[in-house]
């Protein structure tokens, strides 16, 4: 006891001698009466074994050097200007502590070290356990889970069932796979902690491993119980896309919604078969409705198998750069050829790689540099769409289709663009087509990070060719 008070006097002398900020008010010192709830370790509290405990029995951490210093300085500021708000005092204290020289901080660092050693002596079995913030009101299960889980891991998020599954992530719930690092939920099929929608896509993890893409707002199902999460995602998108789906014909709407489910691995096979079925449904009525519907598709709407970009399509082979690029072109242009093309290729592999398919891809790439070439995107992808559906049973040839498209042209600009993109001797083709082989790598192999909202905006009305439609009226 005597030694500790001597210690306190020594520190007071040091503080008076060395601290430039402290001035005449230092007789308050560390040994004087502390503010209520503070952890000053000298004076009457030195022999009290509960000097660091709150009334509820929680053991507080020992003060660091800044806390030792700011406790003294805060008291002085509160005496000088009692009306100052607490947050303003803290802001000023932080600025002043940063401006302090290291030599001025030494006595406070020593005092903090002394407090730390005393804390270790008084509470030998103390362990720092930060309180877990649990959304629901089950405080009991969270405390038992905190005892069972490792206390040092800040990324743990305690599940409701006694700490069984922890959805990993950066502390505070920002656990997309890029930042947090551990985006898979650990225990069994306990997907409750991971389905918080605060940050993009989450993983409802199945058997331990899940895949998280940080772009689309999809809840990817990573294993066995994938169907429910996929259905929930499709239902949430159905509300957003209701206006867009109203424009589509019947088969196209089914195709449109099956595409959302196709983003999950468990539902991809059924979605590809559904896509081929709806393409086959839409094919007979296509010739009748083509001339009426095509103008809407070319210039305002979504195509007969419109793809909201969420990644690589269902039937597409991820290792095939051509399929990847066609998916991206499909997301950026109103018509999406490659899903029906891919599904027909899945049913008959020989029919998948027709030359017209290559040609549509070449014209897609040829049309991309020009800013006014969005209608030509639509025409070229529509041509490859018709070629893939003709390989699966419809009998339209590319020449008829070109004539139809040229009849439909509203402007000479579009006519020249589509002619230029369809003639294989154009300079754009010669520039861009030199490395175009089915197996060769392409520099367009990046994944597509469009969210459904962005792709809806891209495929929306700003692709109109007349300038009056580009004026926003809202």
Swiss-Prot record:
Gene of this entry: SOX4
Biased composition (Gly residues): 158-189
Entry-linked Pfam families: HMG_box
MF terms (GO), sorted A to Z: DNA-binding transcription activator activity, RNA polymerase II-specific; DNA-binding transcription factor activity; DNA-binding transcription factor activity, RNA polymerase II-specific; miRNA binding; RNA polymerase II cis-regulatory region sequence-specific DNA binding; sequence-specific double-stranded DNA binding; transcription cis-regulatory region binding
Record remark: domains: The 9aaTAD motif is a transactivation domain present in a large number of yeast and animal transcription factors.
Subunit description: Interacts with UBE2I. Interacts with HDAC1; interaction inhibits the transcriptional activator activity.
Protein name listed in UniProt: Transcription factor SOX-4
InterPro entries per UniProt: HMG_box_dom, HMG_box_dom_sf, SOX-12/11/4, SRY-related_HMG-box_TF-like
This protein's record includes keyword tRNA-binding: no
Single GO BP term: ventricular septum morphogenesis
Subcellular location: Nucleus
Compositional bias of kind Low complexity: 31-44, 138-149, 266-283, 304-320, 336-354, 366-396, 407-416
Predominant location: nucleus
Tissue expr: Testis, brain, and heart.
Renumbered ranges of motif 9aaTAD: 426-434
UniProt xrefs under SUPFAM superfamilies: HMG-box
Keyword annotations from UniProtKB, A to Z: Acetylation, Activator, Disease variant, DNA-binding, Intellectual disability, Nucleus, Transcription, Transcription regulation
Start-end of Polar residues biased regions: 1-10
Modification sites for N6-acetyllysine: 95
DNA-binding residue intervals: 59-127
Protein species of origin: Homo sapiens (Human)
Posttranslational modification: Acetylation at Lys-95 by KAT5 promotes the transcription activator activity and is required during myoblast differentiation. Acetylation by KAT5 abolishes the interaction between SOX4 and HDAC1 and switches SOX4 into a transcriptional activator.
Domain of life: Eukaryota
Region (Disordered): 1-58, 128-228, 262-286, 302-416
One GO cellular component term noted in the UniProt record for this chain: nucleus
Disease: Intellectual developmental disorder with speech delay and dysmorphic facies: An autosomal dominant disorder characterized by mild to severe intellectual disability, global developmental delay, mild but distinct facial dysmorphism, fifth finger clinodactyly, and small stature. Hypotonia, ventricular septal defect, and spastic quadriparesis may also be present.
């Amino acid at each position: 006891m005597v030694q500790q008070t001597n210690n306190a006097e020594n520190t007071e002398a040091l503080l008076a001698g060395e601290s430039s900020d402290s001035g005449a008010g230092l007789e308050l010192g560390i040994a004087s009466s502390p503010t209520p709830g503070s952890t000053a370790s000298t004076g009457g509290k030195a022999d009290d074994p509960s000097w660091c405990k709150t009334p509820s029995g929680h053991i507080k951490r020992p003060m660091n050097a800044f806390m030792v210093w700011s406790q003294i300085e805060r008291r002085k500021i509160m005496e000088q200007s009692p009306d100052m708000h607490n947050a303003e005092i803290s802001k000023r204290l932080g600025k002043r502590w940063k401006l302090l020289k290291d030599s001025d901080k030494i006595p406070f660092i020593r005092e903090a070290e002394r407090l730390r050693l005393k804390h270790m002596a008084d509470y030998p079995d103390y362990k720092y356990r930060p309180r877990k913030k649990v959304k629901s009101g089950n405080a009991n299960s969270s405390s038992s889970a905190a005892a069972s889980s490792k206390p040092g891991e800040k990324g743990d998020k305690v599940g409701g069932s006694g700490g069984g599954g922890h959805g990993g992530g950066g502390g505070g719930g920002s656990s997309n796979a890029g930042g947090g690092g551990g985006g898979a939920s650990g225990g069994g099929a306990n997907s409750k902690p991971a389905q918080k929608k605060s940050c993009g896509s989450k993983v409802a993890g199945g058997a331990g491993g899940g895949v998280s893409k940080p772009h689309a707002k999809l809840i990817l199902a990573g294993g066995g119980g994938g169907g429910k999460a996929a259905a929930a995602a499709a239902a949430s998108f159905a509300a957003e896309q209701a206006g867009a789906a109203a424009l589509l014909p019947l088969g196209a709407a089914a195709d449109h919604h099956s595409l959302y489910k196709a983003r999950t691995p468990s539902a991809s096979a059924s979605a590809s078969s559904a896509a081929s079925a709806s393409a086959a449904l839409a094919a007979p009525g296509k010739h009748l409705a083509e001339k009426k519907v095509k103008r809407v598709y070319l210039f305002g709407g979504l195509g007969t198998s419109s793809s909201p970009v969420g990644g690589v399509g269902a039937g597409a082979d991820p290792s095939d750069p051509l399929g990847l690029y066609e998916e991206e072109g499909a997301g950026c242009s109103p018509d999406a050829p490659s899903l029906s093309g891919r599904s027909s290729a899945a049913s008959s592999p020989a029919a998948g790689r027709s030359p017209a398919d290559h040609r549509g891809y070449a014209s897609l790439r040829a049309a991309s540099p020009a800013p006014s070439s969005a209608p030509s995107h639509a025409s070229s992808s529509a041509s490859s769409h018709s070629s893939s559906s003709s390989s699966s049973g419809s009998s339209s040839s590319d020449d008829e289709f070109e004539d139809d498209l040229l009849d439909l042209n509203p402007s000479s600009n579009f006519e020249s663009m589509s002619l230029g993109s369809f003639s294989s001797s154009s300079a754009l083709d010669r520039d861009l087509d030199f490395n175009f082989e089915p197996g060769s790598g392409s520099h367009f192999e990046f994944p597509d990070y469009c969210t459904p909202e962005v792709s809806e905006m891209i495929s929306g009305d700003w692709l109109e060719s007349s300038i009056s439609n580009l004026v926003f009226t809202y």
